[in-house]
């Protein structure tokens, strides 16, 4: 496993349009919205930083700014949800998410979620 061990290691930056990153972020936001007791859904405003780390799967380490949308929790298509106009309603927050993904086993889990 000489070749494999070289791949493991430090987190490296990942492009915002990376498919795995997008999936990880979507998953993190779904979990965030599930756990929040807000009646509105939140979604990502912008990605501040994103890294991936190859362990026995892929760990995505993300710092994102999220905002509260005008859509209730039940709404399916979050991407088309508008953000609240009033800043105190929009509640922009910076969150750190760590998602662990093993795509070939179809496994994904949120390891860390902390928002300021």
UniProtKB/Swiss-Prot annotation:
Modified residues (Phosphoserine): 80
Cellular localisation: Secreted
Residue ranges annotated as motif Secondary area of contact: 53-57
The keyword Secreted appears for this protein: yes
InterPro entries: Cystatin_dom, Cystatin_sf, Prot_inh_cystat_CS
Keywords noted in UniProt: Disulfide bond, Phosphoprotein, Protease inhibitor, Secreted, Thiol protease inhibitor
Site feature: Reactive site: 9
GO molecular function, one term: cysteine-type endopeptidase inhibitor activity
Domain of life according to the entry: Eukaryota
Disulphide bonds in the chain: 71-81, 95-115
One GO location term (cellular component): vesicle
Function recorded in the entry: This protein binds tightly to and inhibits papain and cathepsin B.
PANTHER family xref list: CYSTATIN (PTHR46186:SF2)
Protein family per UniProt: Belongs to the cystatin family.
Name of protein: Cystatin
Source species: Coturnix japonica
